[in-house]
Amino acid sequence: MTDIERDVRKVAERARDAAADLAPLSRDAKDEALTAVADALRERTEEIVAANAKDVAQARENGISEAMIDRLTLTPARITAIADAVHEIVELPDPVGEVVRGKTLPNGLELRQIRVPLGVIGIIYEGRPNVTVDAAALCLKSGNAVLLRGSSSAYSSNTVLTDVIRQALASTRVPVDAVQMVPGKSRESVKHLMRARGLVDVLIPRGGASLIQTVVNESTIPVIETGTGNCHVYVDEAADLDQALKIVLNSKTQRCSVCNASETLLVHAGIADAFLPRALAELREAGVTIHGDERVRSYDSSVVPATEEDWATEYLSLDLAVRVVDSLDEAVAHIRAYSSAHTEAIITDSQAAARRFVSLVDSAAVMVNASTRFTDGGEFGFGAEIGISTQKLHARGPMGLPELTTTKYVVTGEGHVR
């Protein structure tokens, strides 16, 4: 056993012990701890900003893009927003102990199915240090211990944020080891985390497709896939074109670097002449680079010829792949071929078309006459989320507090025997 493997197993063992102590704690105890964390973030803002500045300076030296540097950067205002988000989690209902269903059996036994924590959750994520706090707060509220493995590009930031959280927990009833960083910057530590079966109950990767696929392919621990969003908007032949244009622009440009932004626009041939010239002009004015098929390029010669790779790409930028289709079924076939199963939208005034699209498209969220940008725990009214699950087990769609639990059955009898 290497030193790195030994270190990873040590933190996982401590997390397992902490999870056992955390699981039975009351909501008051957990909320008290989260309030202490939020207060500590505000009190130690200067220290957090200083640590983050080291990461940002190193990122610039390494030639990281400005978009990635923006994700990495923590300002006093952003730290305040992170602390506010922790307070919002305090206000959310505690899912632990919730009775999912219950009944009295014919033999008189009382049966209840109740929510319980998953146990130890490993979070593997890229260069967004706010995830350190968000993930820790959500896991604590749902009664889980958490092991955090962020990007090496945010190592200084994640280290100080984890220290802030742990020092805040030290004065509360929540065990300090309920929140730990996986030691080291090397990929070897990630490898050993992914193989800590029996100590870690589930891994949740947050980041790009490459990170997620690496974890899915190499982990011996159950994985919940989150985030990759090759989202589609289909403008049907029965669409209100003014409404469609508004939704297309919002889905792509309101915030292009997030997983629920649209990446491909599919337009029915029956309305292409009326819709595409307007849509292409307004998208271009908004700074969007269009990658289109031959029919799209016939409306605008400046459109970049689309390749097979474009249809499968999650750009996370002001780029959009555009294709003309001859039918709703052709749009669905395209989505089935290239979608990441995150969010797809249909714009139509035809109830029959909407019903068919909803029934045929197999994604975590399907929008009818609404922007893909609404796939979000907060927008759905669920509160904060750990990510958007694009798989079917154990959760699908926005993963809030209930999705960070499992269930167990409690059966109460009066001396019953079988």
UniProtKB/Swiss-Prot annotation:
Domain of life: Bacteria
Listed GO biological process terms: L-proline biosynthetic process
Location relative to the cell: Cytoplasm
Keyword annotations of the record: Amino-acid biosynthesis, Cytoplasm, NADP, Oxidoreductase, Proline biosynthesis
Keyword NADP set for record: yes
Catalytic EC class: oxidoreductase
PROSITE patterns cross-referenced by the UniProt entry: PROA
Molecular functions (GO terms): glutamate-5-semialdehyde dehydrogenase activity; NADP binding
E.C. designation(s): 1.2.1.41
GO cellular component: cytoplasm
Pathway terms, separated by semicolons: Amino-acid biosynthesis; L-proline biosynthesis; L-glutamate 5-semialdehyde from L-glutamate: step 2/2
Catalytic activity: L-glutamate 5-semialdehyde + phosphate + NADP(+) = L-glutamyl 5-phosphate + NADPH + H(+)
UniProt function note: Catalyzes the NADPH-dependent reduction of L-glutamate 5-phosphate into L-glutamate 5-semialdehyde and phosphate. The product spontaneously undergoes cyclization to form 1-pyrroline-5-carboxylate.
Record family assignment: Belongs to the gamma-glutamyl phosphate reductase family.
Listed name of the protein: Gamma-glutamyl phosphate reductase
Organismal lineage: Bacteria, Bacillati, Actinomycetota, Actinomycetes, Streptosporangiales
